[in-house]
Amino acid sequence: MPAGPVQAVPPPPPVPTEPKQPTEEEASSKEDSAPSKPVVGIIYPPPEVRNIVDKTASFVARNGPEFEARIRQNEINNPKFNFLNPNDPYHAYYRHKVSEFKEGKAQEPSAAIPKVMQQQQQTTQQQLPQKVQAQVIQETIVPKEPPPEFEFIADPPSISAFDLDVVKLTAQFVARNGRQFLTQLMQKEQRNYQFDFLRPQHSLFNYFTKLVEQYTKILIPPKGLFSKLKKEAENPREVLDQVCYRVEWAKFQERERKKEEEEKEKERVAYAQIDWHDFVVVETVDFQPNEQGNFPPPTTPEELGARILIQERYEKFGESEEVEMEVESDEEDDKQEKAEEPPSQLDQDTQVQDMDEGSDDEEEGQKVPPPPETPMPPPLPPTPDQVIVRKDYDPKASKPLPPAPAPDEYLVSPITGEKIPASKMQEHMRIGLLDPRWLEQRDRSIREKQSDDEVYAPGLDIESSLKQLAERRTDIFGVEETAIGKKIGEEEIQKPEEKVTWDGHSGSMARTQQAAQANITLQEQIEAIHKAKGLVPEDDTKEKIGPSKPNEIPQQPPPPSSATNIPSSAPPITSVPRPPTMPPPVRTTVVSAVPVMPRPPMASVVRLPPGSVIAPMPPIIHAPRINVVPMPPSAPPIMAPRPPPMIVPTAFVPAPPVAPVPAPAPMPPVHPPPPMEDEPTSKKLKTEDSLMPEEEFLRRNKGPVSIKVQVPNMQDKTEWKLNGQVLVFTLPLTDQVSVIKVKIHEATGMPAGKQKLQYEGIFIKDSNSLAYYNMANGAVIHLALKERGGRKK
């Protein structure tokens, strides 16, 4: 070919070839810059983000939009994948790359790296061998096992430098001299506070133990420690690999932690997004009363608990333990007894014996049933599939047989305590659990629960409970005090009374008297009043505290010359009123209960004509032809019937007792016996029936009255001012008793609900007025503490 055409042909090709050569070398830059020129509205991301976008676009182009949705769900919190959102500025570039990858115009993501990075990768790929590249690729493998812990690192506690040096020096000596040195040091310095860290309860003991272990490893190093240190000193690369592995492990742990937190956050967000009230009722199933369903029988709580235990053991041990842990019912026991053979019965007997004796060796023997004593039929020749070859079989070794129960062996029944044959123990246990006494105990416990739980009590029980409550709570229902005392007295009779003992010192006499009078009931108070009135004979020695002289003259029937002997324990009678001279006809009078002395028993005196002879009689006897004076209408209804009068001759004067006891109070002047109506009003025991009507009392008495309140002396109630003082109030007769309680509360601090007021033997109520109780000027009201349930101290 001529030179001309040859020279002329090359110039045109170089024009297209020169731009083609750089396009092959700079394919990525041209692809990135080429679409930017014709396409308007595409924002190109920076190089590090562009690489991720290109890779994602290539995967989405190959795998479809489902892969994009999966990436968007997995990387919802990763800001590097925000280009997947339609509102992101790089989303248009991402869609453009996806379309190019689908059309085959774009290359793989590796070509999308900038030019400078491509040149560096090409140079490094040319320099590094293939093995090194494989190692670089394998560095991203997730570490499986944690790195070994540091052996010579222990964070020092926050103590002073001197104490830290003491701990370290002690650890060095213990590591050098051994545990014997530590024991001697603990015994020698047990009182030295600086060595308290040697005690296991101390907070520095763990740190001291770590130091001892570290110093021991240094002083007495393990076998492979020197070779390991020598190897690491010769090859620093191995140390760097260990450091890198630790760093990767730390990063892996951090990633796992973040992943768990993200999963928890996703779960929380998912739960928060659920509208739990937005549901649709698909179908409603109504069970009719006459409908019969294939449902299991109802279970008791005991059976349910047994099933739960069986399930837990099944999950823990598997199917092998299910038969041993199974709880069998009575019907299953009967079926097994009929179906099983005598060897199985022996196995069950062995299990019962193991349950009673509870030894570990026999529990192990339960898993492998012992060979029965009864002869077994010879087994059939084994088939090849059933042959089991034991390699450790020794025919000469003696086989330890677990103890089997002898035919005449007896076991003690845990229910009745009787000796039962071992072969019949299981049947005895089954029958013993059906004892009717157990049913009675169960019914009794059910009744106790029903009585405790008043919700299930029938109407009659509720009525009786309210009636009993009303009889005891007078502060609520206002029942008479006598009825309360009766009810509470009936309860107190059943309780043993606590006896108060005096220690013999005069200083404790008053306190012992208060303790002795603490449990006095209303009936005892009535008896004391009767004794004070002389209606019944009394034994004063019962109320005295301390040693007393024995009775020199016991009570005995009177001799013929005397009618009655006065009890020796009564105080002496200084003077007996001589009755006036009476005419000869027989006339009998009964001396009424006149309080001659504080507590002397008064005998009724009967005069007889002179010369008459009286036959001997007992101290208390009904005399014939005696005109008994009837009781006045003002007598309280609570008083017991008076004893029959005693007949005394006219000229008879009772002799004083041999052993006189001094009276506790001065004797009032003696009054003549007949006028019973002339008793002072304050001496009578009043009731509400004997009071004057309120309107009549107001007509007779006008103006305010002065009332005295006797406060008890209660030193144990320090919050109230109860020192035995007397409070004086001036109130109109129309005021209620509650006004007095308010004033007492203001003066002493004692709440009105705790106050109990008594006026002349009557417990006054808050709702009544002063005129209702006929309170005159100078009336004395006694204050007491109201106990819960009406009990009085």
From Swiss-Prot:
Keyword check for Transmembrane: no
Bias type Pro residues, positions: 8-19, 368-384, 665-675
Biased composition (Polar residues): 509-518
Composition-biased stretches (Basic and acidic residues): 21-34, 388-397, 488-502
Ubiquitin-like domain residues: 707-793
Record-level GO cellular component terms: catalytic step 2 spliceosome; nuclear speck; nucleoplasm; nucleus; spliceosomal complex; U2 snRNP; U2-type precatalytic spliceosome; U2-type prespliceosome
Substitution effect: L169K: Abolishes binding to SF3A3
Tissues where this protein is expressed: Ubiquitously expressed.
GO biological process terms, semicolon-separated: mRNA 3'-splice site recognition; mRNA cis splicing, via spliceosome; mRNA processing; mRNA splicing, via spliceosome; U2-type prespliceosome assembly
Compartment(s): Nucleus; Nucleus speckle
GO molecular function, one term: RNA binding
SURP motif repeat ranges, renumbered to this chain: 52-94, 166-208
A Pfam family matched in the record: ubiquitin
Region annotation (Disordered) ranges: 1-43, 318-428, 488-518, 530-584, 665-688
Modified residues (Phosphoserine): S320, S329, S359, S413, S451, S508
Residues where N6-acetyllysine is found: K55
Sites bearing Phosphotyrosine, chain numbering: Y456, Y759
Keyword Repeat (UniProt): yes
Keywords: Acetylation, Isopeptide bond, mRNA processing, mRNA splicing, Nucleus, Phosphoprotein, Repeat, Spliceosome, Ubl conjugation
Site feature location: Critical for binding to SF3A3: L169
Domain of life assignment: Eukaryota
Record annotation: effect of changing E48F: SLURP 1 motif acquires binding to SF3A3
Record remark on domains: SURP motif 2 mediates direct binding to SF3A3.
Job of this protein: Component of the 17S U2 SnRNP complex of the spliceosome, a large ribonucleoprotein complex that removes introns from transcribed pre-mRNAs. The 17S U2 SnRNP complex (1) directly participates in early spliceosome assembly and (2) mediates recognition of the intron branch site during pre-mRNA splicing by promoting the selection of the pre-mRNA branch-site adenosine, the nucleophile for the first step of splicing.
Quaternary data: Component of the 17S U2 SnRNP complex, a ribonucleoprotein complex that contains small nuclear RNA (snRNA) U2 and a number of specific proteins. Part of the SF3A subcomplex of the 17S U2 SnRNP complex which is composed of three subunits; SF3A3/SAP61, SF3A2/SAP62 and SF3A1/SAP114. SF3A associates with the splicing factor SF3B and a 12S RNA unit to form the mature 17S U2 small nuclear ribonucleoprotein complex (17S U2 snRNP). SF3A1 functions as a scaffold that interacts directly with both SF3A2 and SF3A3. Identified in the spliceosome 'E' complex, a precursor of the spliceosome 'A' complex.
Official protein name in the record: Splicing factor 3A subunit 1
Native source organism of the sequence: Homo sapiens
Gene: SF3A1
